[in-house]
Amino acid sequence: MKLRLFTSGILGDDKRSMETTQDLWFFRIVHDFFATFEGVSVYQKIFASHFGQIALIFLWASGNLFYVSSQGNFEQWVSDPLHTRPIAHAIWDPQFGQSAVAAYTRAGASGPVTLSTSGLYQWWYTIGMRSNDDLSTASMFLLILSVLFLIAGFIHGYVPLFKPSLAFFKDAESRLNHHLSALFGVSSLAWTGHLIHVAIPESRGQHIRWNNYLSTLPHPDGLAPFFSGNWSAYSTNPDTFNHVFGTSNGAGSAILTFQGGLNPQTGSLWLTDIAHHHLAIAVLFIVAGHMYKTNWSIGHNLQELVEGHNIINGRFNHKGLYQTVNTCLNLQLALALAAVGTICSLVAQHMYSLPAYAYMAQDYVTQAALYTHHQYIAGFIMCGAFAHGTIFLVTEYDPEINADNVLARFLENREVIISHLSWVCLFLGFHTLGLYVHNDVMLAFETPEKQILIEPIFAQYIQAAQGKSSYDFNVLLSSSVSDAYLIPTQSANKGIWLSGWLNSINNNTNSLFIEIGPGDFLVHHAIALGLHTTTLILVKGALDARGSKLMPDKKRFGYGFPCDGPGRGGTCDISAWDAFYLAIFWMLNTIGWVTFYWHWKHLGIWQGNTKQFYESSTYLMGWLRDYLWLNSSQLINGYNPLGMNALSVWSWMFLFGHLIYATGFMFLISWRGYWQELIETLVWAHDRLPIVLWPEKPVALTIVQARFVGLIHFTVGYILTYAAFLIASTSGKFS
């Protein structure tokens, strides 16, 4: 058999010589819709993909429901949520030895299982599910919905009769009407209905299903108070603090309340408060969706509304913004991602401070996993918002349409914005690191009393104003003689509007308002440094994307060109891709600090020992030794020469995550000549083995490609490593 020489493609005597390993990188334009589709088809394809996205979400939920109903222990967990570990699914692995089978056979299972840390058990329990039949029925329902949405996506994307016109996509008022009223408003109203008719009765021991749904009143008075205007009747007689969730013991009859705080039995928000919240959201959004002019000649015209916005004698006006937002898809996506990213971070906060799901506050591993998961997701989404905002400025921004409006002035004043952000980053960085390093030196020289410890008195004052009494500020809700405390009645318990608030905020077993000290002060400023630096990089990358002071106009460069040093004319100054690339590292860095802080603080609260955090968090060695190293000890002993335990999979993942993370640096710190030699060596090796021929011409990675590969490895390894550490160190203490 004649071997094909690996040089044949290079020499040009092979008809496939035009093919190179660069072909692998065609996926980089997979989201460049305008290069792939024309005109209205771009909008139609995006619209159709939304149905596919929803179908995937339903399929994911359906799969979880199916696995738990068939392989989980939902019914056993329901009977004792505090002492039963939830099972995600069974494990069938022929590589398991006897000790592995024994270690992973837990939570009452007959064989090896994976435990659930997703909070799904708590969610399903809270919304009224109680049996495996409930789960399997819901699974089938969502599977059918998923198929229907896939069909809808196909019809709207590929069947000419059902493809929407361009006018449909440009009709902003109708889109707002549909999104605000139908998607947000009606779905919130439907969820309120489920909570009132199914979840709240179930939490009080009353089983509601299709056979008695229409014959059982969710409130003793039915709809009479609604039609008579006596709406307060729905909030009278709420559940007591002693109510045992899932039973009638201590249950009330109220369905829409404003108690505030957390249920002391479940550690979660009151279900009747949640129902009230969703009803209010429904009313607000249904009304908001009908404020704009659609089929009738009433309501606001959005363009007139936006362009009528003149501030300071016409400066900073909004003329041209309506047309810009309504025609520029990257700007629309950037705004949507910015909003969703912020909401996702807020969800992470609520997962621990105001948990909506019963008994999730007592499942520490799940709380830690959900908080960390949502913060990382938020970081990626918000960086994506800046990336698409930058692509908008490079490819879609029209200076003539936006002449002298607020967007144009934002670009004109970019030097001031960037310099102020830069100053803030320098201030935060030098001062925060200076304090940490000073404290490290004092500990190293055995004079801890010389540490600089700053009490966060302003933050403590804000907590005290909300009712936190441990600081002895005696201000507003933390003072029993304050008007805020006494109004509207003189009763100490019911004087404030949210009667359950003071009980919850001063309960040190929850995370509602956690006590803070000098360690918190320092790490808050470290996190502020990370946030501002990430923002600086992203904002500068966006504002200088089309051209900077050094290079006035490089719009034709596009978005994805590298920062290649001053030798090529200083493209570092305006490489938007490079700014995004660098910002991802800072985003990961910042979320690392956030999750370290959150986890260490909560380990102390959960274990009833907050002193270690207060004493060790004021200097860097404390973080490295008493948080990272100390909490790694169980993890790295998941398997050793003497055997293994149930943490072994996390130990392996911890090691593997480090490997992926470290591999990233091979791509990030290297010369391109090295890549050319390496890839040619690989192709030569392939050609020596005739069954694995490599037809393409070997071409090294470009700068952008190598950085992209390195960034992906760095990111995946970074997150896998911390995920393993987080779950293993928490479950090792509270299993």
Curated annotation (Swiss-Prot):
Function: PsaA and PsaB bind P700, the primary electron donor of photosystem I (PSI), as well as the electron acceptors A0, A1 and FX. PSI is a plastocyanin/cytochrome c6-ferredoxin oxidoreductase, converting photonic excitation into a charge separation, which transfers an electron from the donor P700 chlorophyll pair to the spectroscopically characterized acceptors A0, A1, FX, FA and FB in turn. Oxidized P700 is reduced on the lumenal side of the thylakoid membrane by plastocyanin or cytochrome c6.
Organism, as annotated: Bigelowiella natans (Pedinomonas minutissima)
Primary location recorded for the protein, binned into one broad class: plastid
Gene Ontology BP annotations: photosynthesis
UniProt protein name: Photosystem I P700 chlorophyll a apoprotein A2
Database matches in NCBIfam families: psaB (TIGR01336)
Record gene name: psaB
EC number(s) reported in the record: 1.97.1.12
Binding site for chlorophyll a B3: M666, Y674
